[in-house]
Amino acid sequence: MVAPVAELRGVEMRWGARPVLAGVDLVLQPGERLVVVGPSGSGKSTILRLLAGLQLPTGGSLSIHGIPQTYLRLDQRHPPDVRLVFQNPALLGSLSVRENVGFLLYRCSRLADAEIRQRVDQALEAVGLSVNIGEQLPGELSGGMQKRVSFARALINDPSIPSSQLPLLLFDEPTAGLDPIACTRIEDLIVRTTQMAQGSSVVVSHVHSTIERTAERVVLLYDGLFRWAGSLADYHQSENPYVVQFRSGSLRGPMQPGEH
């Protein structure tokens, strides 16, 4: 039996006396595309930071590929293949586009420069960018192009991680603040990138088009707990009061504005 890509059991997270997650259970299967939704401040991005190994839960257990995660990613000798795409592209401004996309290969592999260049070019083309921008600096690109460069970077395999391990791709509010056309381009890239990497993905978003275009399964987080989980089709039809309120954007319902 194949182990889940990620498994959270009774996960808690506190900031001082304030609970952010209050006993969250979640299982992510290989190849699955999950979208975590909920109002601002509900703890969605905290889930991503835990999965990425940037923080450890203050309670409960977290496993990636069946291995308990008890150390931060930077403290692990053999960390799992988890790739985080930030809302801000988070590119290194002093490095070229090619060096940003191939950063892991330049730093950790023994591949020849020509091989690295070929892999970077393939990643750039996969996200609809010309290989001719490889020598440009990120600051010379538009915001949309920078975001696509960050997606290309997510397609690069970490040479220190076994190729048999399926990657987990994490996307933090990838379409926040974008116009509808730009949203569509990024949403298509999320699906394509996940498929090309042959991995699973977790998207945090409150943008309805992103839910529609990227989700196979949806979970709704509010006040530190998952209040609903189901397929995208079930999300459309659910009469769960949290889902109904989130879909409609109504002020009436169990989720109260100004609480988070």
Predicted features and spans:
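H-loop/switch region of ABC-family ATPase nucleotide-binding domains
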Residues: 205-206
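ABC ATPase NBD coupling module
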Residues: 69-83, 107, 235-238
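Catalytic Walker B motif of ABC-type/P-loop ATPase nucleotide-binding domains
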Residues: 164, 169-172
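Conserved ABC ATPase signature
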Residues: 137-141, 145
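Helix-to-loop junction immediately C-terminal to a conserved catalytic motif
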Residues: 52
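A short, surface-exposed alpha-helical micro-motif characterized by mixed small hydrophobic
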Residues: 211-213
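Conserved ABC ATPase "signature" region
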Residues: 114-132
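Helical segment within the ABC ATPase nucleotide-binding domain
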Residues: 184-196
